[in-house]
Amino acid sequence: MRKPIVPFDDIWKNVVNAAQALEPIPDALGDVYLVRNLYGTVRISVSDAVEGDESCLAALQRLARRLHEVLGAHGVLQENGILFVTDAFLKSIQGGKREVRPNVYLVDRLVTASDWWTVGEPPFPGKAARYTLYSVKGGVGRSTTAAVLAWHLARNGKRVLVMDLDLESPGLSSAVLEPDRRPDYGITDWFVEALVGQGEQVIGRMTAAPRWAQDFDGDVRIAPAHGRESGEYLAKLGRVYMDTDVDPWPVRLHRLLMSLENECTPDVVLLESRSGLHDIAAATVTDVAAHVLLFATDSESNWTDYRILFRHWQQHDLAEQIRERLSIVSALTPEFDTERYLQRFQEGAWDLFRDHLYDDVEAPDSADGFSFDLDDDDAPHDPLVIHWTRGLAAGASLHDLKHSTVSLAYASFLDRFDRLARAGSPREQ
């Protein structure tokens, strides 16, 4: 008879129960890492400095035996379950670690999605206010909103840099920039040229201004996915996200961002992110110290996908680091029965934030907690509203943004955005 299956989702619970049931780990062991590898099997990794310590070895063997008993196919035989490794290796695997018990941690080795495990400040100080336009699903108007926001901010005297980082589905630049105004190079060009030390040579030739911005007091610079000619776009795209021997992909993105900010000296940077839960999107949400506009529609599939992300932040103790930089956007708000739709949307957003990111107001130490009622104005779950209109429907040209059309669709959104900007994002406070 086959043993009952122990599914992947039960590993954490079983690891916690197994580790907490054992006697205390000897202090001489230092930190103990339970490493869940790419196959989902769990081994113990500790410093090779304790390899000859009999008391430490006995404690590790007890833990390895218990893990083998409770993890099923995700466990390994006791004799293969302990690895003595260098301190340098232990340091390299600590990103996203979760505490099982004092001095015992579970860590994951991943092919993708590892950038969702941390929420950090950039290694270089930024001067401009940054906003990431993100969604778990595509087709919700992020490109149009980036163009409208740039238009609005430039009309009010701001210098704006817009970066098209949706590199798998580029379209912002072609929608906003006329062919004769597109720059020689784009973001994909910088990433491949920077690999051979030529990044700074293309920075000055990879932004351009849309024609409609020339009459404004401010300025708009668009950094497109590719230049005037796309060239070998797929070959370049295949090299964009690679980690180098010196810098991982998020740090390379920081270098590009800082170089463009130094070149264009913007007041505001708008980052159009890739949609979905891939690492590529994670870097623009968690790693660039931007305020994140979360585009959503009132559909169960949207809320389900956002719950996956929010639950991950909650389970990995990242809620406090990320929640103050989030604002939900009601994208594609319908023309008819709008009030009822927005009520349902706000309730769905409140459920999402309340269940995963807001503090429990019933807790005795929650007097200063981060929590909001359903109808609190300007709370993270209180949506910035974009109304669907025929004038800004899919495929509409953004070469000539008409004030009347923008006002009809975006008046409420822009008013809320201005209040958000005046309040300042966490990185500006």
Identify the meaning behind each predicted range.
Residues N37, E54, Q78-D87, G227, ...:
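Beta-strand-loop-alpha "switch" segments that mediate conformational coupling across diverse proteins
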Residues G126-S169:
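Walker A/P-loop phosphate-binding motif and the immediately C-terminal alpha-helix
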Residues H381-Q429:
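C-terminal helical/tail subdomains of lipid-metabolizing enzymes
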Residues V148, H152, A175, A283:
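Active-site signature of alpha/beta-hydrolase-fold catalytic machinery across serine-
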Residues M1-L110, S114:
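Long, basic/Gly/Ser/Thr-rich N-terminal segments
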Residues A113-P125:
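Pre-Walker A adenine-sensing motif
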Residues D10, S55-L71, A88-L90, N156, ...:
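Conserved catalytic-core segment of NTP-binding enzymes
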Residues L167-N262:
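P-loop/Walker-type NTP enzyme "switch/lid" segment
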